[in-house]
Amino acid sequence: MTTLPVQQLYIHGQRVDATSGKTFRTVNPATGDVIAEVQVASQADVERAVQSAAEGQKVWAAMTAMERSRILRRAVEILRERNDELAHLETLDTGKALAETTTVDIVTGADVVEYYAGLATAIEGIQLPLRESSFFYTRREPLGVVAGIGAWNYPIQIAMWKSAPALAAGNAMVFKPSEVTPLTAIRLAEIYTEAGVPAGVFNVVQGPGREIGQWLTEHPVIEKISFTGGVATGKKVMASAASSSLKEVTMELGGKSPLVICDDADLDRAADIAVMANFFSSGQVCTNGTRVFVPRSMLAAFEAAVVERVKRIRIGDPMAAETNFGPLTSFPHMENVLRYIESGKAEGARLLTGGGRATEGALANGAYVLPTVFSDCRDDMTIVKEEIFGPVMSILAYDDEDEVVRRANDTTFGLAAGVVSKDVSRAHRIIHRLEAGICWINTWGESPAEMPVGGYKESGVGRENGLSTLGHYTRIKSVQVELGDYASVF
């Protein structure tokens, strides 16, 4: 059992006590043990964090872009040096397998910081002549203070995804991690400070989203909100941001993504991709391809191939090197996923494997749900329509391309989509018809720093990562210059 000291807030370059006098517990989902008590920020603490950010941002923005770039690159070096230490803490807090957090979470998050550190010096405006005596130019200026609100499935990675472009562009960020997985955001803040980021440029406030999130979205000093989470909460955040001071928003929300297997696909490759698209990170990935469309002629063979692979999944202690499937991140979430599984059974889906909680030995103490595969699924089933955010695959048979495209697009979500086919032209044709912002052909799930990430429809607004994101952390100032005489009409 690991017990950490009481976790504080991080404001103006140091850990500080919250003034609310309240705390909440963060729990190890593999064991049910309490890891730490975490202090809850009061509204006065949030105000202190915002004012600190406003002060720090002026110092940060006054630095040259090259100075900011060097500091962010130093943060990357520290992140990579402490990869294993941070991964251990992330596994403790989230339940994700250590084999995953050591190779993905910190590594890919640091990649994003490194990517934007390189772009910090490339933020530029334009200059155009209007006539011989006049021209105009544009400047891209930082927004000022922005807020990031993180989700519980990739805590430190999301904190880096949100802070990296914001800081590279000269902004300061007040970040609120999920209260389910609150531990690593403060470690990131300390690393930024150690690297040379001025006090106040990255502050961390803890507590329930319904309070802290509202205070951030309504604060008049904050110019932008970057939110990752569910659709219903995202709509509230967006409405609050608009009604308070017309803040800009980036929303990375939910998904119910289709994975289309074509009849010419290699069966083994298709099954491998489907299993990765559903069970990586115990199924807790917003882009997961949980609606797997399979040609009716391939259905039996595909089902057998998927079940064979699911049986090879190694469920266990997430700290064990051999484990590649840990518990869900919280016990309440486990109960929610189990309710969805029961609804699948009740609505007539055919259970191929899994279908309940893992209760063997020590697993009974944790929030473990067995990798679950349903077939004979219909588009009107609850498990097919709603985001489960857990290890539940729904297999749906189809007969032709037009049908599968229509059914794949028949959703309010539009986050991700994938196609598996040996015919590249066919794969591109189908992908271009699918209504989704992140798409993969003959693979699934990779999100490199260079690739914009975001959804269509109710899956989001704006993008994270990629070159275009950097521009959304700046605003354009246009300046006209007249070198000649000025003639008034009056």
Curated annotation (Swiss-Prot):
Chain positions found as Cysteine sulfenic acid (-SOH): C286
EC annotation from Swiss-Prot or TrEMBL: 1.2.1.8
GO biological process assignments: glycine betaine biosynthetic process from choline
Pathway(s) per entry: Amine and polyamine biosynthesis; betaine biosynthesis via choline pathway; betaine from betaine aldehyde: step 1/1
Cofactor: K(+)
Entry binding sites for K(+) 2: L246, K457, G460
Record-linked Pfam families: Aldedh
Record-listed K(+) 1 binding positions: T26, D93, V180
Keyword hit for DNA damage: no
Cofactor note: Binds 2 potassium ions per subunit.
Function summary: Involved in the biosynthesis of the osmoprotectant glycine betaine. Catalyzes the irreversible oxidation of betaine aldehyde to the corresponding acid.
Protein's name in the database: Betaine aldehyde dehydrogenase
Species lineage: Bacteria, Pseudomonadati, Pseudomonadota, Gammaproteobacteria, Lysobacterales
